[in-house]
């Protein structure tokens, strides 16, 4: 009789796990409380995998050895509460997939910057000729890559929801880009619980491994000081200079380890903002620890185009710059976006609030924002936060309307910045849909 795994959710993570499990000889059952997409149904049918949609049948799960929970399913969902009584281990996709590869894993997590850092790291390693794949929250699922390929290195973008359900998973190089309040709706508003989840990137690391962390983040630094780890700690910081630190000096990224000091010139680096410099420092340090030359690192960074929906320049129309930062779904991401603005800015903000505290933005809004355009079904919290410090504040209910209003307000050489600070699912399918609608509305001006 085959060992059985039940997979909750038939999205990218669920289908990837189903593919890998089937290939490894497991009996697989996929259950999704929502409607399963046609492409996912075709994939599962092609593999001969039993599935169900719009329900969860507990009786079909009782004989499973493992439950793989897709990251989008909250821990408090009724099905997970029901499964507790069965005492079946619940694991994440990255936990399951890591059982079937001996590759070197680079795990990148954080509240902001993890996608850009993962993409930079992948580009540098790929440019250096490494046999590497980019997976996790970006690109294909990790499980699908393990099922279909045998790469020697994986750069994984990892969310806290995936780290919540690991047991033996470990990264040879773990990276934490920063920790700020985000997804607190999934952690009962408890920042310490969210922080604890992110710190699990260090779990199971040994003395041959490395934990890279943002030394400019005081909350993260305190958390790192409190962990008991055998891994080598290495911070990247725009402020500090020590051994086992990556820092900035004379327009260069300086990587100091116990053995060597390496300098990488950042002149002409295309991505702007302190946050992108920190992302580049993290990616450069990963590459350096894997013996990539500083010349290759610099060349890769100079040719890095940036991730979509992250301070993405769209168009300049009548000398007004339109910038798509739809991925900025929390206050910290918006802070870095506003910090990088060098001209008066019309700021489009709003969506589904995730427990935001906007006070950290007040100095930047006073200094850089000439008008705020609210885009969401419920904008009251944003209005209450910024009306006292903003001369112009307007509400809109569609992206097209928001962009048209922004065009009327903006003057020559101003910026129009979409940086929502909120989730997208009140008016849009996801942040990509929101960003794409912004770009389309700008093109139609």
Please identify what each model-predicted range represents.
Residues 12, 74, 112-116, 277, ...:
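Residue-level detector of alpha-helix initiation sites
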Residues 20-23, 58-62, 71-215, 219-231, ...:
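Phosphate-binding loop of NTP-binding sites
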Residues 41-42, 359-414:
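C-terminal helical cap/extension that packs against the catalytic core
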Residues 4, 16-24, 263-370:
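Nucleotide phosphate-binding/pyrophosphate-handling subdomain across enzymes
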Residues 27-33, 211-215, 348-349, 368-377:
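Short internal beta-strands
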Residues 1-92, 96, 384, 394:
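N-terminal leader/targeting and accessory segments in enzymes
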């Amino acid at each position: 009789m085959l060992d059985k795994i039940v997979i909750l959710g038939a999205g990218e993570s669920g289908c990837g796990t189903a593919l890998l499990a089937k290939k490894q000889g497991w009996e697989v059952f996929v259950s999704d409380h929502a409607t399963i997409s046609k492409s996912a149904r075709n994939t599962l049918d092609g593999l001969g995998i039993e599935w169900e949609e719009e329900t969860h049948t507990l009786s079909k799960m009782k004989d499973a050895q493992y439950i793989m929970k897709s990251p989008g399913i909250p821990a408090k969902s009724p099905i997970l509460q029901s499964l507790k009584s069965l005492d079946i281990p619940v694991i994440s996709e990255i936990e399951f997939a890591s059982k079937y590869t001996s590759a070197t894993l680079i795990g990148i997590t954080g509240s902001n910057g993890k996608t850009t850092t993962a993409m930079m790291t992948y580009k540098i390693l790929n440019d250096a000729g490494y046999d590497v794949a980019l997976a996790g929250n970006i690109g294909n699922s990790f499980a699908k890559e393990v099922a279909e390929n045998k790469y020697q290195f994986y750069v994984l973008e990892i969310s806290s929801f995936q780290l919540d359900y690991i047991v033996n998973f470990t990264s040879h190089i773990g990276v934490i880009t920063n920790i700020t309040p985000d997804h607190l709706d999934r952690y009962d508003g408890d920042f310490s619980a969210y922080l604890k989840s992110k710190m699990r990137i260090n779990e199971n690391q040994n003395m041959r491994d490395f934990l890279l962390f943002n030394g400019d983040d005081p909350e993260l630094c305190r958390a790192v000081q409190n962990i008991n780890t055998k891994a080598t700690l290495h911070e990247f910081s725009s402020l500090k200079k020590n051994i086992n630190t990556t820092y900035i000096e004379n327009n260069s990224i300086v990587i100091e380890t116990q053995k060597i000091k390496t300098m990488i010139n950042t002149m002409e680096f295309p991505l702007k903002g302190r946050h992108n410099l920190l992302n580049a420092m993290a990616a450069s340090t990963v590459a350096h620890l894997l013996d990539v030359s500083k010349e290759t690192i610099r060349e890769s960074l100079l040719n890095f185009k940036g991730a979509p929906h992250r301070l993405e320049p769209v168009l300049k129309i009548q000398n007004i710059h339109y910038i798509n930062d739809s991925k900025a779904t929390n206050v910290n991401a918006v802070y870095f976006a506003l910090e990088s603005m060098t001209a008066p800015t019309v700021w489009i903000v709003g969506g589904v609030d995730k427990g935001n505290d906007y006070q950290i933005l007040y100095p930047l809004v006073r200094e850089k924002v000439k008008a705020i355009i609210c885009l969401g079904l419920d904008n009251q919290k944003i209005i209450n936060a910024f009306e006292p410090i903003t001369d112009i504040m307007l509400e809109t209910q569609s992206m097209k309307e928001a962009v048209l209003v922004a065009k009327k307000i903006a003057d020559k050489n101003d910026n129009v910045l979409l940086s929502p600070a909120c989730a997208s699912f009140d008016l849009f399918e996801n942040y990509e849909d929101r960003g794409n609608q912004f770009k389309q509305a700008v093109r139609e001006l």
